[in-house]
């Protein structure tokens, strides 16, 4: 009876460790997807046009009005 109880406790502890690590890895995966996904990288590309040297002040003002 003692052996069965110890095996049960060890199994419960191991299952909790697995479930917590799965949640942690899932959270890391979601962060990686949001940073490197299409929508995450799109936000980094929005300001590339404002640093182009060939743009005039009117172009910059128009872009700023569009992004508001």
UniProtKB/Swiss-Prot annotation:
Alphabetical UniProt keywords: Amidation, Antibiotic, Antimicrobial, Cleavage on pair of basic residues, Cytolysis, Hemolysis, Membrane, Secreted, Signal, Target cell membrane, Target membrane
Localisation: Secreted; Target cell membrane
Tissue and organ expression note: Expressed by the venom gland.
Recorded consequence of changing residue 34 to K: Increase in antibacterial and antifungal activities on almost all strains tested, and increase in hemolytic activity. No change or increase in antibacterial, antifungal and hemolytic activities
Name of the featured protein: Amphipathic peptide VmCT1
Result of changing residue 35 to K: Important decrease or loss in antibacterial, antifungal and hemolytic activities
Cellular component per GO, a single term: extracellular region
Residues marked Important for activity (site): 29
Record function comment: Cationic amphipathic peptide with antibacterial activities against both Gram-positive and Gram-negative bacteria. Also shows antifungal activities. Is mildly hemolytic against human erythrocytes. In addition, when tested in vitro on the parasite Trypanosoma cruzi (responsible of the Chagas disease), is able to reduce the number of the three forms (epimastigote, trypomastigote and amastigote). Also shows antiplasmodial and cytotoxic activity (tested on Plasmodium gallinaceum, and MCF-7 breast cancer cell line).
Phenylalanine amide modification, residue list: 36
Mutagenesis / variant outcome for changing residue 30 to R: Decrease in antibacterial activity against the antibiotic-resistant bacterium S.aureus, and important increase in antibacterial activity against both antibiotic-resistant bacteria E.cloacae and P.aeruginosa, as well as in increase in hemolytic activity
Biological process, per Gene Ontology: defense response to bacterium; killing of cells of another organism
Protein family per UniProt: Belongs to the non-disulfide-bridged peptide (NDBP) superfamily. Short antimicrobial peptide (group 4) family.
Consequence the record notes for mutating residue 26 to K: No change or increase in antibacterial and antifungal activities, and increase in hemolytic activity. Increase in antibacterial, antifungal and hemolytic activities
